[in-house]
Amino acid sequence: MQVKIHELAANELNEAIEWYELQSKGLGRHFKKSVIEHIDKIKMNPDWFLIEADTIHKAYIPKFPYKILFTKESNKSITIWAIAHLHRKPWYWQNRIT
């Protein structure tokens, strides 16, 4: 399944990786690995994940206060709209979805 990542979601991911790496060497890599593993799980079965709103699904990242927000565009692709921190600005990402 093809994965499209919104530009701002990619920025969020990179900022979080950098922040975690500054907190503890290797922690940023661990966060990135966890996100990639969850994206792989989303690709295998996107319908398994809970609905956040309308057609937006959410996948929580274990051990980190983040969730991946995505839509299933077809049986062949998903779009990741946000890599959102759980304790900051809820619903800020909604204006990204057209």
Predicted regions and their residues:
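Generic structural signal for secondary-structure transition and capping sites
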Residues: 25, 40, 44-47, 88
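Enriched for short, Lys/Arg-rich terminal
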Residues: 67, 71-98
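Arg/Lys-rich, positively charged N-terminal/basic patches that mediate binding to nucleic acids
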Residues: 1-32
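Generic recognition of well-ordered alpha-helical segments
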Residues: 15, 33, 37-40, 44
